[in-house]
Amino acid sequence: MASIQNLYETVVGVLGDQASKVISALGEITVECLPEHYISVMTALRDHEELHFELLVDLCGVDYSTYKNEVWQGKRFAVVSQLLSVKNNQRIRVRVWVSDDDFPVVESVVPVYNSADWYEREAFDLYGIMFNNHPDLRRILTDYGFVGHPFRKDFPISGYVEMRYDEEQKRVIYQPVTIEPREITPRIVREENYGGQ
């Protein structure tokens, strides 16, 4: 635990006002920052001689709109990165809150960490978070014609469109979802002596 406390103090000293919040909980350090400080925070964590977080091992988008099963009062979207220092055998989490809920945009960290390339594409594809100055920001998991972003909390379970093969046109076509809602009533079977009576 002493190393976590030392890491916490070093991070607070190095980042200063660039970090909105530095949290030490459950044996992990989380740095929260605003979008305008994102690149400088990531660069400082990588380049500072005492920190040396040279690897970005994960980056993902998060939709907090129904966090803890209630209406979320803060910003809706965040980009969360996990960094690793091989030299110091330490990990740190960086969370940047995206300022606009309707059109989420944050700066790309690909110039700082090359490994962020496909992670940022995945966050764009699944959450609709745009990354400024990304070298190749396009969908990576869904179809190019896919409508919406499926990991957003307001995305319908059935989606917006479905695709099927049309025999007449001899090709795959897209059409609006044709799911018919139905009511399912459970069948109740009563047995004699059920419940020991």
From Swiss-Prot:
Listed Gene3D superfamilies: NADH:ubiquinone oxidoreductase, 30kDa subunit
Enzyme Commission number: 7.1.1.-
Alphabetized SUPFAM superfamilies for the sequence: Nqo5-like
Gene Ontology molecular function terms on file: NADH dehydrogenase (ubiquinone) activity; NADH:ubiquinone reductase (non-electrogenic) activity; quinone binding
UniProt main location, coarse: membrane
Known catalytic reactions: a quinone + NADH + 5 H(+)(in) = a quinol + NAD(+) + 4 H(+)(out)
Superkingdom of this protein's organism: Bacteria
GO cellular component, one term: plasma membrane
Swiss-Prot/TrEMBL keywords: Cell inner membrane, Cell membrane, Membrane, NAD, Quinone, Translocase, Transport, Ubiquinone
Its membrane topology: Peripheral membrane protein
UniProt cross-references to InterPro entries, sorted A to Z: NADH_DH_suC, NADH_quin_OxRdtase_su_C/D-like, NADH_UbQ_OxRdtase_30kDa_su, NADH_UbQ_OxRdtase_CS
Cellular localisation: Cell inner membrane
Subunit (UniProt): NDH-1 is composed of 14 different subunits. Subunits NuoB, C, D, E, F, and G constitute the peripheral sector of the complex.
Entry similarity comment: Belongs to the complex I 30 kDa subunit family.
Function: NDH-1 shuttles electrons from NADH, via FMN and iron-sulfur (Fe-S) centers, to quinones in the respiratory chain. The immediate electron acceptor for the enzyme in this species is believed to be ubiquinone. Couples the redox reaction to proton translocation (for every two electrons transferred, four hydrogen ions are translocated across the cytoplasmic membrane), and thus conserves the redox energy in a proton gradient.
PANTHER family attached to this UniProt entry: NADH DEHYDROGENASE [UBIQUINONE] IRON-SULFUR PROTEIN 3, MITOCHONDRIAL, NADH DEHYDROGENASE UBIQUINONE IRON-SULFUR PROTEIN 3
HAMAP family: NDH1_NuoC
Name this protein carries in UniProt: NADH-quinone oxidoreductase subunit C
Record organism: Neisseria meningitidis serogroup C (strain 053442)
Gene from which this protein is expressed: nuoC
